[in-house]
A protein has these predicted regions:
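N-terminal helical cap/lid subdomain that shapes the substrate entry/recognition surface
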Residues: 2-98, 109-114
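Asp-based, Mg2+/Mn2+-dependent phosphohydrolase catalytic module
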Residues: 1-3, 93-96, 100, 109-208
Length: 208
C-alpha cells in the first residue's frame, strides 16, 4: 500500500535548472569555461558540488569551497520568485486527503533547500540532505535514509526525479520512480530506471 511520496528538489518541485545554469556560467567564466545547456545536463545536473568543480576545473580544498559558496549565493539571489511544477500543490493536497506523508530528498546544500522550499511555501514533513548523510545521488543512500526515517519499505513509496542521477538513486533503493520531463530526455530517464515519465504533477494524480 502506498504511504509516502518522495521528491527531488531542483528541477522537480520547481524548474530551477535555468537559474543554476546561469549561476554556474557566471562563476565559471573567470576560469575561461563556458557552460552550455548540454554541458549542464551531462556534467552538472544531479551531482554534488565538490564532484562538479573537481570534474570541470580540477579544484578541491579551499578554492573549491569558495567557488561553491559563490555559486550557491548567486543562485539564491536569482531564485527569488519560484513557481512550482504544475500540479504539485494539487498532488500534495490529494496525498494529504489520502493520509499519505511526503518528503524531499536532495543533493542541494541546506541553505539552498531551505530557500527553495520557503519560496514555494512548502514545509515537508521529511527533508533528507545528501551532504548530511555522507553520500549523494546517484548513490541510493539518501533514499534509503528517507525510508528508514519514515519506517517504510521501498514498495510503500513513490519517488519523483528529474535527472538520471536522481532516478538511479531512488531505483537503487528499490523505490518505484517516475521521471519529470523538466530538463532531461525521457529516454535517458527510462534508461536510468524510471518506470515512466511525466510532463507535470497533474499526470501523477493517477498514480495515487
Amino acid at each position: 500500500m502506498l504511504r509516502a511520496l518522495l521528491f527531488d528538489l531542483d528541477g522537480t518541485l520547481a524548474d530551477t535548472d535555468p537559474l543554476h545554469l546561469l549561476a554556474w556560467r557566471e562563476v565559471l567564466a573567470p576560469y575561461g569555461l563556458e557552460v552550455d545547456p548540454e554541458t549542464y545536463r551531462r556534467r552538472i545536473s544531479g551531482r554534488l558540488n565538490p564532484e562538479i568543480v573537481r570534474d570541470l576545473l580540477g579544484l578541491k580544498g579551499e578554492e573549491a569551497r569558495r567557488l561553491i559558496e559563490a555559486k550557491e549565493a548567486r543562485f539564491r539571489e536569482l531564485a527569488q520568485d519560484l513557481e512550482p511544477t504544475p500540479g504539485l500543490y494539487g498532488l500534495l493536497e490529494e496525498a494529504g486527503r489520502r493520509g499519505l506523508t511526503w518528503g524531499v530528498v536532495t543533493n542541494a546544500p541546506r541553505a539552498n533547500a531551505r530557500h527553495v522550499l520557503q519560496a514555494l511555501r512548502l514545509a515537508p514533513p521529511l527533508l533528507v540532505l545528501a551532504e548530511e548523510v555522507g553520500r549523494g545521488k546517484p548513490d541510493p543512500l539518501p533514499y534509503r535514509v528517507a525510508l528508514a526515517r519514515l519506517g517504510l519499505r521501498p514498495e510503500e513509496a513513490l519517488a519523483f526525479e528529474d535527472s538520471p542521477s536522481g532516478v538511479r538513486s531512488a531505483v537503487g533503493a528499490g523505490i518505484p520512480t517516475y521521471g519529470l520531463l523538466t530538463g532531461h530526455e525521457a529516454a535517458d530517464l527510462r534508461a536510468a530506471g524510471a518506470q515512466s515519465t511525466l510532463k507535470d504533477f497533474w499526470e501523477a494524480l493517477a498514480l495515487l
